[in-house]
From Swiss-Prot:
SUPFAM superfamilies: Ribosomal protein S5 domain 2-like. It comes from Paraburkholderia phytofirmans (strain DSM 17436 / LMG 22146 / PsJN). Keywords: Hydrolase, Lipid A biosynthesis, Lipid biosynthesis, Lipid metabolism, Metal-binding, Zinc. Pathway: Glycolipid biosynthesis; lipid IV(A) biosynthesis; lipid IV(A) from (3R)-3-hydroxytetradecanoyl-[acyl-carrier-protein] and UDP-N-acetyl-alpha-D-glucosamine: step 2/6. GO terms for molecular function: metal ion binding; UDP-3-O-acyl-N-acetylglucosamine deacetylase activity. Belongs to the LpxC family. Catalyzes the hydrolysis of UDP-3-O-myristoyl-N-acetylglucosamine to form UDP-3-O-myristoylglucosamine and acetate, the committed step in lipid A biosynthesis. GO terms for biological process: lipid A biosynthetic process. HAMAP family: LpxC. Its cofactor is Zn(2+). This is UDP-3-O-acyl-N-acetylglucosamine deacetylase.
Amino acid sequence: MLKQRTIKQIVKTVGIGLHSGRKVELTLRPAAPDTGIVFSRVDLATPVDIPASAMAIGDTRMASVLQKDGARVSTIEHLMSACAGLGIDNLYIDVTAEEIPIMDGSAGSFVFLIQSAGIEEQNAAKKFIKVTKPVEIRDGDKFARLDPYFGFKLKFTIDFRHPAVDKTGQALEVDFANTSYVREIARARTFGFAHEVEMMRELGLARGGSMDNAIVLDEYRILNNDGLRYDDEFVKHKMLDAIGDLYVIGHPLLAAYDAYKSGHGLNNALLRELLAHEDSYEIVTFDDTQKAPRGFAYETQTAFA
């Protein structure tokens, strides 16, 4: 049986919020089978638990934001991406602010945190959402689409008119049957343009943003002294985001995802469109791990690692 997973022990870290610039404490705790990924605002007088779900995403302008009873947890996508890549089904995430810390701007720190806690299989079947009919969302020239596929593969195309991005490639296709999330995707950092960062700071945003947690570009080049971690780091980061955005549906998808200039809003709209059509998906489990898609059928190894 392909089993659900959680972590073996509690782990903690401290970072800063990308937009607030304030210190945030993050604690990951093991969770029982069928709990899902649950964020908890432990800094509030009465802590609020917010289970990750497509319907709980309330704001997608700068990040994916979970909302419930007036409480918010923002910038969840990198941590959710790490959970997807490592096959974590059940986890409590305690946070002392309304923002998950940005760490180094990628999912790499969260992968390290989860791996250092250890991954434990649980005595319950891992549930997948198997897409059975195509689903698509369009917004002008942008689109995001899910097609039936026995596995999980993604194709993402960006369109940033910038010399540095043009040089590194605007499109990427990855099938996790033969690609390592940890090696090939997890370390891709978020990126932004210097003039946009200044504008955001004037609005009280991006106070924690720096070259320690983002790739920063001027009109012509990358300003970071250490350059890029991957030749195609820009599009890889957008794929990292998409993996995290899609994982808020509550289970790993068995599907082919294709997107052009998609972002947090379009990704969430795609999930809602899928859930609105009950004939376009089904929940499946695998009693025989050998019959599960490659990339998920590891007994003790991480999901796409």
